[in-house]
A protein has these predicted regions:
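Domain-edge interaction signal
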Residues: 1-186
């Protein structure tokens, strides 16, 4: 499993940046736009955008930390103090059981690199207009399918990059990069 350190500020500001471009959106749309931005960033640069851990859930990949942040905002409580603190950047309301997220502040774009912004904007362009069903089907790629069948639903960044058609050289770079970042390669 390739592990990277989660950059909490980058995760927060990536979500805020997405919302600043698309307006209020449901969890699903935000998660999938971020997932495809992560995939593109891995393919092109050998590094994830946020380092968040993606879980293979029934409707596609879900970033764990961002999910905890949104749930903390929605419930105004969390067992995770950090998620509760970061949740203040969002307002979550439900309409017909669907959770919609609205930012309560602007993103700090200094937390995002030019390549992060490029990947997010490309993902928005490619995925914003897709229906729930279309983006779900698109996100059910080989990385999702592999993790979804496993006892642990955590998706490997190497599998995510491979499903995004990263070159063999880039896949090798991702392995080395993950080893150097966390010393937790297994």
């Amino acid at each position: 499993m390739q592990a990277f350190n989660v950059d909490k500020d980058k995760t927060l500001n990536a979500a805020l940046f997405i919302l600043s471009k698309i307006g209020q959106a449901d969890y699903h749309k935000i998660f999938k736009i971020l997932y495809f931005a992560e995939q593109q960033h891995l393919k092109n640069y050998g590094q994830p955008l946020t380092g968040d851990v993606y879980q293979a859930m029934p409707y596609g990949p879900v970033p764990s930390l961002l999910y905890d942040i949104f749930k903390a905002s929605e419930n105004q409580s969390s067992p995770f103090n950090e998620a509760l603190e970061l949740s203040k950047a969002f307002l979550v309301t439900r309409e017909e059981r669907i959770p919609y997220v609205t930012p309560t502040r602007e993103p700090d774009t200094d937390e995002l690199s030019e390549t992060n912004i490029e990947a997010i904007l490309n993902s928005i362009s490619e995925n914003q207009q897709l229906s729930f069903q279309e983006i779900t089907e698109k996100s059910h790629d080989s990385a999702w399918a592999k993790a979804e069948k496993a006892p642990e639903t955590e998706m490997s960044y190497l599998d995510i990059a491979e499903s995004g058609n990263a070159s063999p050289e880039m896949l090798k770079y991702i392995i080395i990069n993950s080893e150097n970042q966390t010393h937790k390669f297994y």
